[in-house]
Amino acid sequence: MTEPLTTDPLAADTPLLPHVVVGVGAVNSVGGSADEVFASLCAGRTGRAELRGFDRDRFRAQHAYEIDDRPEPGGDVTGRATRWLVRAIEEAARDAGLGDDLGEVPILIGTGLRELRSAELGWRDGAAFDVSELHFGTALRERFGAVRTYTFSNACSASLYALAMGSDLLAAGGADTVIVAGVDTLTESMYGLLDRVHMQPPDQVRPFDKDRKGVLMGDGAAAIVLRRGDGAAGSAVRGLLRSVYVNCDGYHVTAPDVAGVAEALVGAHRLAGVKSEDIDLVMLHGTGTLLNDEAEALAIGQVFGAHAGNPLMTAVKSMTGHTSGGSGLLGLIVALSSLESGRVPPTVGLREPVEEAAGFRFVRGEHAAAELRLAQVNAFGFGGVNAVAVVERAEK
């Protein structure tokens, strides 16, 4: 949630009536649907593999978490992010019982890189590519008749920023139903940037481990159908959205600010009308980078205080890689599945937690089984764009 708006339903200190999630969809390196992704994560399966999309000889790092859908090894094609986005939205809409005509439904998309990979292939290699294909709205209009399409490029918290806007639209009466999605794919430029800033090239993502070396990117898309709570009669409810809080602390271009992250946690709890001790599960941002994991752990320690060891915690980027703008919404879908099933995926590769997180209840080894009601989902990005959501289990 952003700063207070003028209408009472969106006042920053007023808990919102929960909106309901009535459909979910996802595709990434560990699965082709939301249910398949969750099953893979609970089994501890990782999408990590040798880099396939471009020439490994140009980089120190040699691995990534890619969707293996290219026509031939070592080659790449345009439009992959758009195809995954459409696929995730199709699944979520089908799950919600919506038809193919989404002309009346706002679609809000969070992305860090959009179709930058297609632009790279077009500009450098001469691949056939029309500039209109950079915009997801073109494909969504053609496939679903969508005309109210919004794109948010807020780095790694983009899809939760989109969720905040979608929540505000519902609260303000601008729509009864919205679709919120997130998507990103590996690009050579971003992979190269990360390859240069790491002191040592990481071979896997190991969030909160003392020996972590950095982040590796992953492909993926996620989507949910969100409906106002008072208009959800007859819907099969996946879970409740209690709050989304966003801020931009502007602390540094890339380094996180503990105070800014902590403010986002406090804001999400306040808007949800809950206390830190009420949270049963934390879906960590957990990128496996030196600064980010430390800052996230310190912020949680400050906000949760004596209760920091209570909730189960996990970081699924250890299996999916960092899916950038889509990662926050993927975390939310996993959180909803965990609340519903009582299963929490493990953090793969976490052997010895960093000192700042020594008292946390990390899920390690195998998935955990627990009775869960409330989950917190974290997403933080470059420039201090922080977003935190709180979701609740739907009572059957």
Where are these regions (language model features)?
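Conserved active-site "lid/cap" helical segment
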Residues: E3-L5, L10, T14, V30, ...
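Conserved catalytic cysteine-centered active-site region
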Residues: L5, D13-L16, A49-R83, R114-S167, ...
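Structural signature of cysteine-dependent C-C bond-forming condensing enzymes
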Residues: D8-D13, D95-L108, T138-R148, A171-V178, ...
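Cysteine-centered functional microenvironments
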Residues: P18, G25, L121, V147-A164, ...
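Condensing-enzyme catalytic core mediating Claisen C-C bond formation in acyl metabolism
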Residues: P18-V22, V27, A34-D35, A39-Q62, ...
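Conserved small-residue
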Residues: V21-G23, L41, I89, I107, ...
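Conserved active-site and cofactor/substrate-binding residues in soluble primary-metabolism enzymes
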Residues: G32, E36, D76, R80-R87, ...
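Short, well-ordered beta-to-alpha junction loops that form the rim of enzyme active sites
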Residues: G110-G112, G182-D184, F380
